[in-house]
């Protein structure tokens, strides 16, 4: 693997490391500017080690890298960003054009490494300033390959450095605000309102089913509801109805509310003391104060009973039949 490929891999790893180590753009990390300055000086020093460095056959256009602090202060933030992006983009085009004129050589390898550094700088600046199309700035034509390396150094020491040190903190804060912004209370309420109220819908469905149930009264409704219970489902038993007496409660003794659906052994306890009259929206009947049960309706709704009464239940008042003890 050539030295150029190794440098490109190192640049990619550095970019990924700077991106993952902090939530801010890579240009906001001061280590990036220091690294680019150090590498540009080192790369330029290696140019003297290449034999037969000749001028380019075709001059390349390079950006004007002269810097004036007074002129810099009079420019707007947008004009500064466009000026720097245009200069770095033009420098990258000049380096690629110069390398395209050369055969594989020491100078060509150095120009490849230089293009990698310029690409890294351009990507970092675009992450901070955006990818807006920069205007065409002032250019100068050069045939000396050394001018390519010097242009990068002057850009880093001048416009890029002042941008990152003076304008950079405010730009970095502005770029990181969208990723750390907390949604407002209004958006949270709107998001919560999108979810259906499943609890209220379930209660409404249950109330409507009970309200449409026709039968002699609350006792038949409860009996019909009990008749629909699957044996063994509530108490995790696997026997049939004939084999398991008292299958609803799963025990052979009166139970509390923890071992069955209904507590007690007599249907007299199934009176509705906890049911508030008028709790059901439609079809609710007034309770008979003497028996605790609603009167028999004169007409069944729709001509049928949704939960028919079970013929296997004992009559009210009769004690449960316990199996003989062997």
Swiss-Prot record:
GO terms for cellular component: extracellular region; extracellular space. Residues 308-326 have a biased composition (Pro residues). Glycans are attached at residues 197, 206, 235, 249, 256. It is found in: Secreted. SUPFAM superfamilies: 4-helical cytokines. It holds the Pfam family EPO_TPO. GO terms for molecular function: cytokine activity; hormone activity; signaling receptor binding. Residues 1-21 form the signal peptide. One of its GO terms (biological process) is megakaryocyte differentiation. Disulfide bonds join 28-172, 50-106. The keyword Disulfide bond applies. InterPro entries: 4_helix_cytokine-like_core, EPO/TPO_CS, EPO_TPO, Thrombopoietin. Residues 307-326 are annotated as: Disordered. The keyword Zinc does not apply. Gene3D superfamilies: 1.20.1250.10. Keywords: Cytokine, Disulfide bond, Glycoprotein, Hormone, Secreted, Signal. Two-domain structure with an erythropoietin-like N-terminal and a Ser/Pro/Thr-rich C-terminal. Belongs to the EPO/TPO family. Lineage-specific cytokine affecting the proliferation and maturation of megakaryocytes from their committed progenitor cells. It acts at a late stage of megakaryocyte development. It may be the major physiological regulator of circulating platelets. This is Thrombopoietin. It comes from Rattus norvegicus. The lineage of its organism: Eukaryota, Metazoa, Chordata, Craniata, Vertebrata.
């Amino acid at each position: 693997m050539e030295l150029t490929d190794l440098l490109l891999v190192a640049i990619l790893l550095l970019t990924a490391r700077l991106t993952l180590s902090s939530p801010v753009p890579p240009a906001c990390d001061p280590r990036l500017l220091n690294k680019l300055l150090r590498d540009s000086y080192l790369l330029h020093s290696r140019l003297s080690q290449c034999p037969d460095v000749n001028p380019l056959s075709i001059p390349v256009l390079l950006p004007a890298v002269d810097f004036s602090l007074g002129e810099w202060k009079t420019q707007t933030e947008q004009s500064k960003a466009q000026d720097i992006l245009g200069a770095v983009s033009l420098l990258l085009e000049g380096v690629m054009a110069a390398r395209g004129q050369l055969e594989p050589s020491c100078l060509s390898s150095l120009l490849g490494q230089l293009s990698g550094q310029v690409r890294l700088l351009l990507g970092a600046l675009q992450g901070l300033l955006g990818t807006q199309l920069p205007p065409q700035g002032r250019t100068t034509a050069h045939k000396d390959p050394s001018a390519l390396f010097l242009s990068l150094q002057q850009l880093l020491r001048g416009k890029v450095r002042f941008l990152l040190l003076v304008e950079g903190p405010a730009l970095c804060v502005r770029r990181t605000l969208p990723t750390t912004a907390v949604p407002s209370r209004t958006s949270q309420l709107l998001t919560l309102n999108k979810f259906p109220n499943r609890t209220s819908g379930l209660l409404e469905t249950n109330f409507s089913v009970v309200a449409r149930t026709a039968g002699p009264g609350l006792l038949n409704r409860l009996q019909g509801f009990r008749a629909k219970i699957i044996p063994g489902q509530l108490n995790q038993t696997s026997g049939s109805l004939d084999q398991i007496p008292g299958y609803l409660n799963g025990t052979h003794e009166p139970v509390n509310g923890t071992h069955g659906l209904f507590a007690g052994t007599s249907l007299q306890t199934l009176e509705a003391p906890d049911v508030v009259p008028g709790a059901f929206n439609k079809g609710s009947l007034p309770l008979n104060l003497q028996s605790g049960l609603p009167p028999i309706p004169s007409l069944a709704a729709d001509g049928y009973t949704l939960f028919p009464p079970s013929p296997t239940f004992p009559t009210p008042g009769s004690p449960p039949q316990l199996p003989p003890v062997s």
